[in-house]
UniProtKB/Swiss-Prot annotation:
Species whose genome carries this gene: Thermococcus gammatolerans (strain DSM 15229 / JCM 11827 / EJ3)
Keywords: Glutamine amidotransferase, Hydrolase, Lyase, Pyridoxal phosphate
Role played: Catalyzes the hydrolysis of glutamine to glutamate and ammonia as part of the biosynthesis of pyridoxal 5'-phosphate. The resulting ammonia molecule is channeled to the active site of PdxS.
Family named by the database record: Belongs to the glutaminase PdxT/SNO family.
GO terms of biological process kind: glutamine catabolic process; pyridoxal phosphate biosynthetic process; pyridoxine metabolic process
Gene3D superfamilies: 3.40.50.880
PANTHER family according to UniProt: PYRIDOXAL 5'-PHOSPHATE SYNTHASE SUBUNIT SNO (PTHR31559), PYRIDOXAL 5'-PHOSPHATE SYNTHASE SUBUNIT SNO1-RELATED (PTHR31559:SF0)
Annotated TM spans: none
NCBIfam families documented for this protein: PLP_synth_Pdx2
MF term (GO), any: glutaminase activity
Record-given protein name: Pyridoxal 5'-phosphate synthase subunit PdxT
Binding, L-glutamine: G53, E54, S55, R114, I142, R143
Annotated metabolic or biological route of this protein: Cofactor biosynthesis; pyridoxal 5'-phosphate biosynthesis
Amino acid sequence: MVKVGVIGLQGDVSEHIEAAQRALENLGVSGEVIWLKKPEQLEGISAIIIPGGESTTISRLMQKNGLLEPVRKLGEEGLPIMGTCAGLIMLSKEVIGATPEQRFLELLDVKVNRNAYGRQVDSFEAPVKLAFSDEPFPGVFIRAPRIVELLSDKVKPIAWLGDRVVGVEQDNLIGLEFHPELTEDTRVHEYFLRKAL
């Protein structure tokens, strides 16, 4: 049975839990999706989602709750991890605009710029092209970080807004600027969860 953990310290956790549950149903896979708050819950985990929210807060709480190092180790060992918006920041190797106390997982070979699109008023929705589907995906961008550079050949673009890369994949990792959980469309979650099957 697949066990998916959504890091539930801050951010849009319940939406990700619902999206992952729907995606598992669509894939015909039995599994559970849990609200992941402490290291003990990582036992038997099949995949992890790091949701959007505020990256400074998520970073601080992951350190405080003892999740940062165990999650990094699991990512290095090949466990599927998807980060959306602030979760992308948490996965990234380099972060422009990070505060000195922020710690990141540094698993994904990308450089991102925090809050590159500006404040809440600059949030928008636009069709995103996916590498694994012909139909456009409804991309919801909320104070999104921006992928400014791919730092190695291991990183493959999987989502584009116009000609700009807004989603990447590196082996077991997926990082997205946008919020797939804020739509009824589960294609991105299904694509990610196939890594755990």
